[in-house]
């Protein structure tokens, strides 16, 4: 494994242990490319998690976009000089960013479409702003772009061209993964004033945006504040129940489709094996997920992923 790929693997180990552990079940020759893919996704998602000013976030996203395009262009020029290095050497921009370097190698080695990586950058722009997610369809499109795309790319690394069934599996799995991430990150997005629960779902259930965006505060009598607090709690329960129902719908469809795929694709989906454990916590906590992080130990993640890897039980 090249130095840049090793860097990506260690990045996964520190930020997203389930991704790191899942990569270890892939064939050794494919691990570096998978680590690079996941590391790129993490870096893109990390921008919305850390940046408070949208303009700064836009600049960082544009940097990743431009750096990847420049690396691919320079690598093609380099390949014209030394054709035999097209899949085995690191690109010229390796010294600038190891994630860009490793992703460039993966794109060239496995003929991955660069547009898919740019799709990640474009979809992540929503994370920079405080606009409410407009509809369930928009949320599913967002999740497919940020998570389903990565699953599709992982499948291409593992097995070459993907079938319609594999694409369907990736779509449902990506939406389920995105919805679980939505719930897991609620304490942070709540602090940032961001709302990912779709406006049309909220409206259909009589939940107003302010019930999700604000906590109870003010100079009202204690009795009135308590009443408002109880109303907000009930509305948040309704909102979370809607997202949980949507998750179960997509995760069930994912499992049904995944069982029909060749075993060689399985490592791509192993990170999803930990999702039910997070969702069970969310179902117990209900509205508390807005303020309390959902945490699963690395050992439990290992157990869930290992069971899926050996027995195909998600």
Model-predicted regions and their roles:
Residues 1-75, 85-106, 110-124, 141-152, ...:
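Catalytic cores of Mg2+-dependent Asp-rich isoprenoid enzymes
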Residues 159-161:
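A generic structural motif
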Residues 82:
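Catalytic cores of transferase enzymes with a strong primary signal for eukaryotic protein kinases
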Residues 125-138:
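Acidic/His metal-coordination segments adjacent to aromatic residues that form catalytic metal sites
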């Amino acid at each position: 494994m090249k130095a840049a790929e090793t860097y990506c693997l260690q990045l996964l180990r520190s930020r997203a242990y389930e991704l790191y552990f899942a990569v270890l079940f892939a064939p050794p020759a494919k691990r570096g490319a998978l680590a690079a893919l996941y590391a790129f996704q993490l870096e893109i998602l990390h921008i919305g998690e850390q940046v408070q000013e949208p303009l700064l976030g836009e600049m960082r996203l544009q940097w990743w976009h431009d750096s990847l395009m420049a690396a691919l262009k320079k690598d093609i020029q380099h390949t014209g000089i030394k054709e035999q290095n097209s899949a085995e050497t690191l690109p010229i921009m390796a010294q600038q960013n190891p994630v860009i370097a490793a992703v460039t190698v993966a794109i060239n080695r496995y003929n991955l479409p660069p547009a898919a990586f740019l799709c990640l950058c474009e979809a992540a722009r929503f994370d920079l702003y405080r606009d409410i997610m407009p509809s369930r369809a928009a949320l599913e499109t967002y999740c497919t772009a940020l998570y389903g795309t990565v699953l599709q790319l992982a499948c291409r690394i593992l097995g070459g061209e993907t079938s319609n069934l594999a694409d369907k599996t990736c779509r449902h799995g990506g939406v389920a993964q995105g919805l679980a991430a939505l719930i897991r990150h609620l304490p942070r997005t709540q602090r940032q004033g961001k709302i990912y629960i779709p406006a049309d779902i909220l409206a259909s259930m009589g939940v107003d945006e302010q019930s999700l965006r604000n906590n109870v505060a003010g100079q009202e009598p204690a009795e009135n504040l308590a009443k408002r607090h109880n109303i907000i709690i009930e509305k948040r329960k309704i909102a979370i129940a809607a997202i949980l129902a949507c998750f179960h719908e997509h995760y069930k469809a994912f499992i049904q489709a995944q069982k029909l795929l060749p075993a060689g694709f399985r490592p791509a989906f192993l990170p999803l094996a930990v999702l039910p454990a997070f969702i069970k916590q969310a179902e117990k906590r209900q509205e508390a997920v807005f303020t309390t992080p959902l945490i699963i130990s690395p050992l439990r993640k290992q157990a869930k992923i290992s069971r899926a890897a050996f027995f195909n039980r998600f």
